[in-house]
């Protein structure tokens, strides 16, 4: 599985941690973020990951900034990109099992243990295919295409 990771200047260390962690688990990582802690504009880096999702360059995405909120706002403006701003394991699981999210946005302030747990649960959780969630996600796509 290919996973894209993007980040702004505040997420460099967290990206480095996750790149090593996920590579050790056997995932292929594509880097769409900055590698420097010099101030950058997060929309530029969110957009790079969003385009990678749209072009099927990666299967899933991880976006890291100060809070995760800015990245999630940008990513959710992009057709076919469904980003969940997640703060805990439960939200990571539900973002996939109910909402079929293909990108997760996290805060660089999340502790490393929780970060690893959240990311693994996001990657490993399948969409449930329960009728009500399928219908709700179809409605989201209808709104997206309106």
Task: Report each predicted region and the residues it spans.
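C-terminal binding/interaction regions
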Residues: 6, 10-13, 89-146
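Short active-site oxyanion
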Residues: 2-3, 57-61, 80-82
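Short helix-loop-beta junction
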Residues: 21-29, 80
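Short, conserved beta-strand edge motifs with alternating hydrophobic and charged residues
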Residues: 6, 30-32, 61-65
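Short, structured active-site "lid" loops
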Residues: 45-63, 67
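Glycine-rich phosphate/diphosphate-binding loop of Rossmann-like nucleotide-binding domains
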Residues: 1, 5-24
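Mid-chain, well-packed structural core segment of small domains
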Residues: 64, 69-108
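A short beta-strand-loop structural module common to alpha/beta enzyme folds
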Residues: 28-39
